């Protein structure tokens, strides 16, 4: 089963409720994630964790970074309440933070790159995957209360000495159990992000997935079936191609098709993007990966802004394909950055 199919298995619903004061003095909130099967609406899985304001603020920063790299302009990323020292225990502030956290989680629902991100899965780490019906059943079937009975004389003789009892208590100090493997697997099934992607990148700066790149390149699935060239040969090919971008149109049909369609020269945004991307290719070849990454991002940003107003349908298609190629190239640079 493909990753795309896995992502579409569940409908998601998030709630943030029941604020309470932790014994250490800060406020924490109950976060409930419900995963409703599309095949069987009665099949509902639930994950509950307790989080504080700083946890939500970190998640907000991580997801905002990912959202910016998606170049989505149709929706505005939700703001989050600012940190404050005074008044943070007031009911109005607690409610504002609760609602801000809930809005953040619900914003991720229609965006696969966010709701299946490693950052969101890490946020729910430690929560046990349960079914609401099982929880209610467990609450109804409670064991009978334990009634203490006075120990018999025989039991009193078998009791350990105080020193032995102290030693036994020291050995029986409870420790927090490590997350079990089945629990980890259950969480992984709900958040279908690639584990190798998590290991190769930091949680806050994960690379974009193939599904996200497909937003810009409708032919990405067809092209991905062939063997990929080596890093060196691909760089050389892209550099030669970029040198011709200001001379040839960014469309499959060539210059004759462009001139026959509208008779106008290539728009200015293509020249600006060409200059940035050409320099980015040179920086990458020289090993200046940070500068190259910035150049790719700025170049792709100009392309996607300009293509929305481009009157040529064929050129728009070509620009989207080029933007996807250079965006994918930018993502490979994450492996070289410290």
Curated annotation (Swiss-Prot):
> Which residues does the UniProt record annotate as the domain PX?
1-131
What residue stretches are annotated with the MIT domain? 266-338
Matching SMART domains, A to Z? Answer: MIT, PX
| Alphabetized InterPro entries for the sequence | Intracell_Sig-Traffick_Protein (IPR051866), MIT_dom (IPR007330), MIT_dom_sf (IPR036181), PX_dom (IPR001683), PX_dom_sf (IPR036871)
- Which stretches does the entry tag as region Disordered? 134-155, 240-270
Q: List all Pro residues biased stretches.
A: 142-151
Subcellular location per UniProt equals: Cytoplasm; Membrane; Cytoplasmic vesicle membrane
Name positions with the PTM Omega-N-methylarginine. Answer: 106
Q: Name one GO molecular function term.
A: phosphatidylinositol binding
* Primary localization: cytoplasm
Instruction: Write out the GO cellular component annotations.
Output: cytoplasmic vesicle membrane
**Keyword Calcium applies:** no
For the modification Phosphoserine, the affected residues are: 202, 228
The domain section of the record reads: The PX domain mediates interaction with membranes enriched in phosphatidylinositol 3-phosphate.
- What does the record give as the function of this protein? May be involved in several stages of intracellular trafficking. Overexpression of SNX15 disrupts the normal trafficking of proteins from the plasma membrane to recycling endosomes or the TGN.
What is known about its subunit structure? Homodimer. Interacts with SNX1, SNX2 and SNX4.
Q: What is this protein called?
A: Sorting nexin-15
Organism of origin is Rattus norvegicus (Rat)
């Amino acid at each position: 089963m493909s990753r795309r199919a896995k992502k579409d298995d569940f409908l998601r619903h998030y709630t943030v409720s029941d604020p309470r004061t932790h014994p250490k003095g800060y406020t924490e909130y109950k976060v409930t994630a419900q995963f409703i099967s599309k095949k069987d609406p009665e099949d509902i899985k639930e994950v509950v964790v307790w989080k504080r304001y700083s946890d939500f603020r970190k998640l907000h920063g991580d997801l905002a970074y990912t959202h910016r790299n998606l170049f989505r302009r149709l929706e505005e990323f939700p703001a989050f309440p600012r940190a404050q020292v005074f008044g943070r225990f007031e009911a109005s502030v607690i409610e504002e933070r609760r609602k801000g956290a809930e809005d953040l989680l619900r914003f991720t629902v229609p965006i696969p790159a966010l709701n299946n991100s490693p950052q969101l899965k890490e946020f729910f780490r430690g929560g046990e995957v349960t079914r609401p019906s099982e929880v209610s059943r467990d609450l109804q079937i409670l064991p009978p209360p334990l009634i203490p009975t006075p120990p018999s004389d025989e039991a009193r003789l078998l009791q350990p000495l105080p020193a032995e009892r102290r030693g036994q208590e020291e050995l029986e100090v409870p420790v927090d159990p490590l997350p079990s493997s089945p629990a980890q697997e259950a969480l992984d099934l709900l958040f279908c992000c690639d584990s190798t992607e998590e290991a190769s990148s930091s949680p806050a700066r994960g690379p974009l997935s193939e599904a996200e790149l497909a937003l810009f390149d409708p032919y990405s699935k067809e092209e991905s079936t062939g063997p990929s060239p080596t890093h060196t040969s691909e760089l050389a090919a892209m550099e030669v191609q970029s040198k011709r971008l200001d001379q040839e149109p960014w469309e499959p049909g060539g210059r004759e098709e462009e001139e026959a369609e509208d008779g106008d020269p290539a728009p200015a945004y293509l020249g600006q993007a060409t200059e940035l991307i050409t320099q980015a290719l040179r920086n990458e070849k020289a090993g200046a990966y940070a500068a190259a990454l910035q150049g790719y991002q700025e170049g792709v940003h100009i392309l996607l802004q300009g293509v929305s107003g481009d009157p040529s349908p064929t050129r728009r298609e070509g620009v989207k394909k080029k933007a996807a190629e250079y965006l994918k190239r930018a993502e490979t640079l994450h492996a070289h950055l410290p």
